[in-house]
Amino acid sequence: MKGLTCFLLCFLLSEAQGFEIPTNGLSEFAEYGDLAELALGKFHVVPGNRRSQEGVDQVTLYSYKVQSTITSRMANTVIQTKVVNHSPEPQDVVFDIQIPKGAFISNFSMTVDGTKFTSSIKEKTVGRALYWQARAKGKTAGLVRSRALDMENFKTEVNIAPGAKVQFELHYQEVKWRNLGSYEHRIHLQPGRLAKHLEVDVQIIEPQGLRFLHVLDTFDGHFDGVPVVVKGQQKAHVAFKPTVAQQRKCPSCSETAVDGELVVMYDVNREQKAGELQLFNGYFVHFFAPESMDPIPKNILFVIDVSGSMWGIKMKQTVEAMKTILDDLRAEDQFSLVDFNHNIRTWRNDLVSATKTQVADAKTYIEKIQPSGGTNINEALLRAIFILNEANNLGLLDPNSVSLIILVSDGDPTVGELQLSKIQKNVKQNIQDNVSLFSLGIGFDVDYDFLKRLSNDNRGMAQRIYGNQDTASQLKKFYNQVSTPLLRNVQFNYPQASVTDVTQNSFPNYFGGSEIVVAGKFNPEKLEQLQGIITATSANVELVLETLAEMDGLEAFLAKDRHADPDFTKKLWAYLTINQLLDERSRAPSAAVKKKITKSILQMSLDHHIVTPLTAMVVENEAGDERMLADAPPQDQSCCSGTLNYGRKVTPNSLPSWVNPLPTPRVPLPAVGPSVIEATPPPHVMRVENDPHFIIYLPRSQQNICFNIDSEPGKILNLVSDPESGIVINGQLISAKKLKDGKLSTYFGKIGFYFQHEDVKVEISTETISLSRGSRVSVLSWSDSALVLNQRVHISVKKEKTVTVTLDQEVSFSVLLHRVWKKHPINVDFLGIYIPPTTKFSPKAHGLIGQFMHEPEIRIFNERPGKDPEKPEASMEVKGQTLVVTRGLQKDYRTDRVFGTDVPCWFVHNSGKGFIDGHYKDYLVPLLYSFLKRP
């Protein structure tokens, strides 16, 4: 399936782009454009039920308080705000807070003009059911939802009456991980306006003792002298309480200068090489971070994506970073480079010592790389694994060394093996047990969940790198984290009769500047002390490290400090356990194992009252008749994908010949039986929601390009017209029930497929699905799952969800059903269509989608700030024209039909003018099965 374009087409509800439902009869969701205008992490006031800023001073931010307490790396943070409406008009107030990615929300409450809303944790489906029950009665006060980017957002909007007060309070918890020799505690401070009382208090309690502590200046010196730091031997207090005058950007300014982060960095004392073992309230925590050891030699393979999408700043920054990284290699290290696009190249076919001459030659090689072509991740990784395996088999590796592979890529595979689960399996089968794979995903076009599973499966970790001017420093920072292996094969051992439910206690490597944390349970009635024994291999010797902790060692210390959290060991154990279970769930080998793990995660989430990917927080008033819902960000994709290859043929042999000399026979497609076919959707396709929003994925450029078509209800748009193959796909528009904001939204209400050579017509509406073969007609309903088999055309209906139309068991088209509640005042049911890559279309294929079966050359350059700071602009050369495009987000509803998944794309204005051939009206056809007549 090389060189093919992958398409996704769907209508994006403008209402579905927000994450809140305002109160008191306001619109169900915020407008997409409006949402983009709301900077993350700020307080917003929306006067007069509009996004105007007139009269915002009539709403006062009375207080903005943040309290953080860190007890032995376990951080609990509370954010509390109070707002008063002095306006004679009702005002909409948005509570919009950023919290660290990976933190668990544990509580949320708010009081609106005397009415208190409190939270409870429910299993996600139960929580959503409660919310929808209230919504059906018109009793939903709002939708609150956290979402994941580099941070996670927690947001809700309320409407407050004149003279009313509203108070918000959010609790979350996280573990502080040691990185490059210190712990960082970051608090995002973006109140959005002057606050009468702005207070930040950070209390740090570390029984090991504080080695150092300082507060970083992230406000360009504006608040010099304002943070007050009091540091003791084992405790510290950081206070940040600027007055209203100090908050002002300038003495006469009404804008606040508080817009950034308060960052506290610290480290603790370490007297024992065996680490610090702490026991309290039936739980133990073992911290291990030895220093002053000789580094272990590394065998390191850098696998670098040099496909066309890396062109420009990404490649420039990667080269800059790699030159510095190569200079940092030690003389005892061995290394090589694998760079790949659709082809695989190696700087050296084997590992070489990191001498000055070899490093200089490698830097010259890196500097000459010119990005182009596709992305063959599968073969690139297998080549790197092969080099390491050969060196090991030939006895060329120091038996006491550490072997690492570092993958740097910015996109999904487009050449060779495309099925992510197959790549994951190939790597797992070929990599040796002593090799760790680290994956760095540049930008947002890469499937980060895949990289995470790939690395977690092979003793490594993944990290997202943001593709900007800072890429080089991010890459270097990551390398620094793994550049100094001090120990390998680290094992934590405790008496089995004394402890239970121990978290991960075996680690392939320990890197200098980091910390390993192990936790578990014990019975305090049967245990007075706990022994921990660590075995590991250093650069020079096999180590056996022993430590002993007393039961009452912490009790007296914690009792003296009212800020200390007596449940820190319990929370830390739960945090580690749940995250490790989530990782195991994403890599579960079978549905049965996944189900068992899911049950454990769910029970722990409910027991510890935290929002995880399997739970939701229901927020309701005392009467229980007004509700909000807070979900965790979408979880990683898991195991057990379907067996049907979605829209592409099975590759006969995904392993290169130099790895597996015996070619794998072609895997047959599954036989179509009586059950409904389900499959994992391909990573790149298209979607449509309203006015139709088209998204075109260009694999060579590895870019998503999107555009809107504004047409009239009843009109029929041609999506694909291929007279040579005899295939037509058209969509008929329907409209919303009434205007909204002066505009009548349109959607696809019918999708028509015509397979001329088979004399088969398929009509899919929001009510029925019909298959016509000559004079014979089969009609199906969305209310039941079903399967209709024709000689060459199969139709699979998944109840109230999707219709899959499969031709010759080779290519599948998916149509998604989007239902709205029956009495919705504006919206109607509609359809979205997804068209995958296929060789079924001839070179004569055209249409709004069909024309991109043959990918046009594009070049995106001169990226710059746009009118909206959240939406940068760029120039795009395509088809002999230079267009101005805008960066934005669209929704993919295939895996999450309710909230969708954000997909970044470059937006072409004026109904795709310049990107599509001609004008969009050229693609109107008279009938649902009409071929497009090209001028």
Curated annotation (Swiss-Prot):
Q: Which InterPro entries match?
A: ITI_HC_C (IPR010600), ITIH (IPR050934), VIT (IPR013694), VWF_A (IPR002035), vWFA_dom_sf (IPR036465)
GO biological process, alphabetically ordered: hyaluronan metabolic process
Cellular localization per UniProt: Secreted
Which residues have a glycan attached per UniProt?
N107, N434
Every copy of the VIT domain together lies at 45-174
Does the record's keyword annotation contain Phosphoprotein?
Answer: yes
For the modification Phosphoserine, which residues carry it?
S455, S875
Coiled-coil regions, chain positions: none
Could you state one GO cellular component term attached to this entry? extracellular region
Record keywords, A-Z: Gamma-carboxyglutamic acid, Glycoprotein, Phosphoprotein, Protease inhibitor, Proteoglycan, Secreted, Serine protease inhibitor, Signal
Q: Which residues form the propeptide?
A: 19-53, 692-935
Superkingdom of the organism of origin: Eukaryota
Q: How is it modified after translation?
A: Heavy chains are linked to bikunin via chondroitin 4-sulfate esterified to the alpha-carboxyl of the C-terminal aspartate after propeptide cleavage.
Please tell me where this protein is predominantly located.
secreted
Residue span(s) of domain VWFA: 297-457
* Signal peptide span: 1-18
Residue(s) carrying Aspartate 1-(chondroitin 4-sulfate)-ester:
D691
Subunit (UniProt): I-alpha-I plasma protease inhibitors are assembled from one or two heavy chains (HC) and one light chain, bikunin. Inter-alpha-inhibitor (I-alpha-I) is composed of ITIH1/HC1, ITIH2/HC2 and bikunin.
Function per UniProt: May act as a carrier of hyaluronan in serum or as a binding protein between hyaluronan and other matrix protein, including those on cell surfaces in tissues to regulate the localization, synthesis and degradation of hyaluronan which are essential to cells undergoing biological processes.
Q: What is this protein called?
A: Inter-alpha-trypsin inhibitor heavy chain H2
Native organism is Sus scrofa (Pig)
